[in-house]
Amino acid sequence: MAAQKIRSANTNGLPRCKSEGALIDFSGVPDPSLSEVKVLSPSSLRIDNPASLENVKEVVAIKDYCPNNFTTLKFSKGEHLYVLDASGGDWWYAHNTTEMGYIPSSYVQPLNYRDSCLSDSGMIDGLLESVDEGVKELDLLGDWTNSSNQDSVKKCHNNPFLRPSVSNPFLNGPLVPQTHTADTENSVDLLLFDPLAPSHAIASETSTDVLLDLLPNTSQNEVTVPVKRDNPFFRSKRSYSLSELSVLQAKSESPTTGSFFAGLKSPAPEQFQSREDFRTAWLNHRKLARSCHDLDLLGQNPGWGQTQPVETSIVCRLDSSGGAVQLPDTSISILVPEKHVASGETQQISLKALLDPPLELNNDKCTTVSPVLEIKLSNMDVQSPLTLEVRISVALGGNASALNMVGIKCLRSDAKEGPYNSVTQIYMYGDTVQVKLDNLEPVMYVVMVAQGQGIVSPSSVWEYINKKVTVGLYGPKHIHPSFKAVIVIFGHDCAPKSLLVNEVGQQANKSAPVTLQLWGKQQFVLPKPQDLQLCLFSNMTNYRVDAGDQGKMVRGFQLKLGKVSRLIFPITCQDSAQLSDFTLRVQVRDEAGGVLSQYCVQTPQPPPKTGSKSTGPRRFLKKKEVGKIVLSPLALTYKYPTFQDRPVTSLKYGKLIKTVVRQSKNPYLLEYKKGDVIGLLSEEKIRLKGQLWNKEWYIGYYQGKLGLVHAKNVLVVGKVKPSFFSGPELTTGLLLEQILRPCKFLTYIYASVRTLLMENIGSWRCFADALGYGNLPLSYFCRVELESETERVASVLEKLKEECNSEGKEKKSFQKELIMALLKIDCQGLVVRLIQDFVLLTTAVEVASRWRELAEKLARVSKQQMEGYEAPHRDRNGMLDSEAMWKPAYDFLLTWSAQIGESYRDVIQELHTGLDKMRSPITKRWKHLTGTLIFVNSLDILRAAAFSTQEPEDCII
């Protein structure tokens, strides 16, 4: 237990149980010194053994602290405490010679603090440069009371401004020459929530709190400070740090002659007449420097030197008319009523989501179900309260005891560390909470929690709720021959679009903290806090994920405390000549090895080449290009999940407010009667042309049939199924049969299909079983023994083609049977790749000679470009046969779809919209593209219901 009490009466000298920090799996970290970290014994903390306290640092409490959490330590003002680990940012791990626990860093002050390596905010200025330093830096400048007498110069690599290699190119190189190394390893109780995660201070605050007092007095003889101490710019501590650092940096480094960054010189304060002028010049210089990439860093570490971090925040200014402020990419918003401020005045609202919650909010009786929200207001002269709307990531248990024992509450505080008080005016509907915020303050912190009443140990609040956690995959903007992907687990559904990541290890001194982009995320229900194993697989043998199949561990206590966990997976390309985007599969396993969640993510493209681009038309896919954008979720693995035919419980329901009977029948547009109830697969809308103009449509289920219903004709009533809902229940088997209707009308190229399946199906036996060839031997599919698994897969596919083309048996559709089999073994990524190819080829054949009109609607292609597409297909006389018109059309559609992006839904949606815009659109007679649009928008619903590891009522989409 992190806050395990250690009694001074215990003198047996036996080592105590390992702390949670020591339980972290460091097997994946290359530095062997982590395995040598020792844990303090109880006897080593006795006061009568002063030699044991050489490795801990003494602080004094500046205010009282009374905890309400078993992991924190109680102390009074003036009491002396001893810090064991100060890497936690807002919370330090300390002891008072009697017991151990966490203390808020803002409540204590180090002795002789001006010479310590702690900033005035109580946070470490930067992450440690290596794992060895992680142990050495806990000796926080040796004896704090005698730090001025030290002979060694302390390393300043903790400071992000003083790193030897950072994204600001004008800060390259050390500020002070290193004369001595740090002391040897110390035996300390190293408690690391996440050894790969930066502190919250680094992620959310600008690293400008730099103190030159960090340098010991002995170093002042080596470096002459060319700044006068009576300069008025340096009366403020922060301004002193920034300005003197800039001057010292400019003096200590001579830029290389002819360097690109030679002109980026930091301004000197003596050049300006006022503090404000200097501040403006310094900020402009800093902005210019940050806009420049460190080319040396990009060359050494491709894929890491990307950009500066971006916060998940928003700032809006509203007038007396009111409005709403929504946090980007989240379901969090603030509703501002009309006349909130007086006429002519404005209210500026800043909304920010803090990823890590305060430690005291997560324990046996309480757990956070939303991020901590920081709300800042500029105008306190208000006439009405605000309304905060948050979607929570939890569902209360279905039994009556859970509803009585646990409730959703909103807590509010004026400080991030607390204390937090309950807000009474709270309203819930479904998974959305509305909170009325009155008694407004300039800065407020709000969080939603699930809090238990009368819960007695060993029970916890987790036993009465179904809490959802989010697993996200982050990576660089462009992939490189060697890069790193990061799997992150959040205790809520707010996964930011970008994330600052520091790697703590032997290579940390070669790469600066960087911002990675969110590639994909998924939510799943975590039944209880437990150790989770996270694995990462690649679908292409050309890419190797280090420790991806064995996985990396996230400890249960980290999840219980709501900490954000970051796990880094290095990825290397075996052959850089074939560098291309590929698919990664994220898998989360529980303690017993069962799969809790898995999903697939398509990586970004490699960086564009700077050379001259070919202006010629794109030809047919070459064989080596086929596997570039395959989204196979289970490639190269032989264990496929089982398709389960069970009810689809994620439907929403709506009441039909209009009767529709169609004169021209369309198999994909529903007919319905006013007053009936219809099931909706989701509230996402599809854009489609109706009888006269474009409309928005829902995918609905009515009277046993799946199709589109005009959104204006449906009044959505919620997730509860009405008792008078008629028609058969929608199951995964029925849904699969309904969405496969258009597949048999699509055109395909067999050679391309065969190549894709050979590259992405890992087991012929599973493939054959899914096609209905259960218990048939391999000899049924091929006459000779085949050694290669890919050839066996090809033989099964060939057998399917023969049976579908034979006249003796019942006629079957090759496309439909193939797609159905792939969906039953959860190869959704491969399915959408095939469907997109089928749709593009079928459209090219259907459009044929009218492809030029379609090209104008989709991309406004010039006449010269059209000639370029047709030129390769003309005969010797320069003529293009009408029967060959599909070839330039197919070339164009392939090129156009690649420019749209990786979203197969967007490609098919935009293609349908472009066809609708044509004169006498072919979609009037060829309606199966509409069915394909329904198909691709229903896949996620089908997969979530058919392969969910939860019970049907707990199904997570």
Swiss-Prot record:
SUPFAM superfamilies: SH3-domain. GO terms for biological process: cellular response to amino acid stimulus; endocytosis; negative regulation of cell growth; negative regulation of cell population proliferation; negative regulation of GTPase activity; negative regulation of TOR signaling; positive regulation of autophagy; protein localization to lysosome. Residues 54-113, 649-719 form the SH3 domain. It is found in: Membrane, Clathrin-coated pit; Cytoplasmic vesicle, Clathrin-coated vesicle; Nucleus. Pfam families: DEATH_SH3BP4, SH3_1, SH3_2, SH3BP4_C, UPA_SH3BP4, ZU5. InterPro entries: DEATH_SH3BP4, SH3-like_dom_sf, SH3_domain, SH3BP4_C, SH3BP4_SH3, UPA_SH3BP4, ZU5_dom. Keywords: Coated pit, Cytoplasmic vesicle, Endocytosis, Membrane, Nucleus, Repeat, SH3 domain. Residues 312-449 form the ZU5 domain. One of its GO terms (molecular function) is GDP-dissociation inhibitor activity. GO terms for cellular component: clathrin-coated pit; clathrin-coated vesicle; cytoplasm; nucleus. The SH3 domain mediates localization to the clathrin-coated pits and vesicles. Possible role in regulating endocytosis of the transferrin receptor at the plasma membrane. Alternatively, may function as a negative regulator of the amino acid-induced TOR signaling by inhibiting the formation of active Rag GTPase complexes. Preferentially binds inactive Rag GTPase complexes and prevents their interaction with the mTORC1 complex inhibiting its relocalization to lysosomes and its activation. Thereby, may indirectly regulate cell growth, proliferation and autophagy. PANTHER family: SH3 DOMAIN-BINDING PROTEIN 4, SH3 DOMAIN-CONTAINING PROTEIN. Homodimer or homooligomer. This is SH3 domain-binding protein 4-B. The gene is sh3bp4-b.
